[in-house]
Design a protein with these regions (language model features):
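Eukaryotic N-terminal low-complexity, Ser/Thr- and Lys/Arg-rich leader segments
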Residues: 1-7, 217, 230-237
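GST-like domain detector, emphasizing the conserved glutathione-binding G-site
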Residues: 1-144, 148-149
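Residues embedded in well-ordered beta-strands within globular domains across many folds
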Residues: 58-61, 163, 219
């Protein structure tokens, strides 16, 4: 499909939610302009002209006449919330990201819902509050149980994988480097647990995600590691 309107993508590499949108943009091969928002000195123009409702990233503007990113056209559509944007892109570029079979689409959306509740809560608990690793591992095992024997979450790469990929990549990054509020060494122990045969299917799933060109184009391992190493929200006391 020929893209009919401009897309400006407001983002920051720290955010797994922004990463979702970035992967989706690459998957559908959209023509877009990425604008990094300084999250340490949040620009006022963003709060008033791009996302006055939640004042969060990611966001996109779509359509309207050409305009500077800091002063988007009033005619441009402004969209926020990562999965809203991902679904919009799937609509804008039909045949990509969204399964055509209604059952598989329902399964994909269920996968997203489970990830955004169960895995996300365990992610926050372990890395930001230092709760036991067992909950995170249990939730990852639950996600693994929903995977087919081969391929992605519902077979072909879809919105389900777009939702999961940024968090799975960061989970592995943080565990391997023992970053988080949990006791020293607990991250590496959990990382080693994930290398055991019990989690072989999940590890293959993550490897397949990381091998996609959309992931490689949207993820800078060294930069993301540096950002999270210096994130005060997950520093140990």
């Amino acid at each position: 499909m020929v893209q009919s309107g401009q897309i400006t993508f407001y983002t920051h590499m720290y955010s797994p939610y922004c990463h979702r949108v970035h992967i989706a943009l690459e998957e559908v091969q959209a023509d877009y302009k990425a604008v990094t928002i300084n999250v340490m000195e949040w620009p006022q123009w963003y709060n008033t002209k791009v996302n006055p409702i939640t004042r969060k990233i990611p966001a996109i503007t779509y359509g309207g006449p050409a305009a500077p990113p800091e002063d988007p056209s009033p005619e441009a559509v402004k969209l926020t919330e990562s999965m809203v944007i991902v679904e919009f892109l799937a609509d804008l570029f039909p045949g990509k990201l969204r399964p055509s079979d209604p059952v598989q689409l329902a399964y994909a959306r269920l996968f997203v819902a489970l990830f955004d509740t169960k895995v996300h809560e365990a992610f926050k608990g372990f890395f930001f509050m230092g709760t036991p690793a067992s909950d995170l591992l249990d939730q990852l095992e639950g996600i693994q149980a929903r995977l087919p024997e081969t391929g992605f979450a519902v077979g072909e790469f879809s919105i389900a994988d777009v939702a999961a990929a940024p968090f799975l990549a960061r989970i592995m990054l943080l565990l391997e480097n023992d970053i988080g509020k949990y006791p020293v060494g607990e991250g590496k122990k959990a990382f080693e647990e994930l290398q055991k045969p019990k989690f072989a299917r999940l590890m293959k799933y993550i490897a397949d995600i990381k091998a996609r060109s959309s992931f490689r184009a949207s993820y800078d391992h060294a930069q993301v590691l540096f950002i999270w190493q210096n994130n005060p929200a997950i520093q140990r006391a």
